């Protein structure tokens, strides 16, 4: 997500006959629950079949033994897309409580997303953001958790970001210079174990209006990391598993990077299995480590991927009937992380480890934005109580070392 992922899918895959045929021929792997509403049954069947098809592709080659992958979640309470809301005493206390719950859940790492221009000198409240994130980092360290920081740009949609920022007229070199300034501040204030400079080039294009070919994206990342002083902080960059592998190859060629980061959302077309395995192979060939910086199941049909809005897709996540698919997706990604020996693996929508919303006549009429807000409130209530969903319980069992 740094974000909340995600972007325009590579057109080539949607036009590839084999890929389209594979999705169209998908059949449900399990009996469909009557709880799944009629309007969502096609999506459910397609995703269920895709996960069932891909699980055997990740054969757990380590012989069932645990790996050193640091499993964790996005600390949504401290995501800078929340804007000025972060700068309140209430959020500080809520973040500390959330960290207590995550520690009890068994996570080993916590991810922080920071969007340009937060923590740059030109931002009017940069001092307040510096203070907030220094405090959050200290709270994370007190609990013995690893810190992953990821930089990027803010979403344009008000449902996804409250940062008031206008990227019109932004040039690529200015964006790179600002990210360099942010990186220096993040290293000084947060001192993360891992710092992902930039990911999801297609998302950055949609947010900023800047184009990013593989070469252009790699050049921007190189602008940030060249001669960057980063004692004790590993540097990385990445992309979504749905884009061309050329992005991963271009990033892997950057000498200053320690790791390549993958984001996983849609499962169609092998995006949660063989595509990641191939990208990991390309990274390893250049001596890079690998990581899964964001992952959550994207509830869309394969044919919707190039046209559905993120707001609509993320609104679908809220309903409780998705729970079995979320659990199976988590299993798939955990298996994948261990197979590629990922440094860390972070699941984005941590709120669904604590609460879903039931699909009712009333909730079926809510807009995607309203569903997202309602699910936030439900999760906050259950985090306060320390109550997990079955998805949260499954997650806890899967990530145990």
Go through each PLM region and give its residues.
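Catalytic domains of carbohydrate-active enzymes, especially glycoside hydrolases
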Residues: 89-117, 192
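Substrate-binding cleft of secreted/luminal carbohydrate-active enzymes
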Residues: 30-33, 37, 291-401
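Active-site cleft segment of glycoside hydrolase catalytic domains centered on the general acid/base Glu
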Residues: 120-132, 158-255, 269-278, 285, ...
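Hydrophobic faces of well-ordered beta-strands that scaffold small-molecule active sites
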Residues: 69-75, 110-112, 147-151, 193-197, ...
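Active-site mouth loops of central-metabolism enzymes
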Residues: 76-94, 165-174, 239, 313-326
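Bacterial N-terminal signal peptides
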Residues: 7-16
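Glycoside hydrolase catalytic-domain groove-lining segments
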Residues: 98, 150, 232-235, 243, ...
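Mature N-terminal, pre-catalytic/accessory segment of carbohydrate-active enzymes
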Residues: 19-85, 105
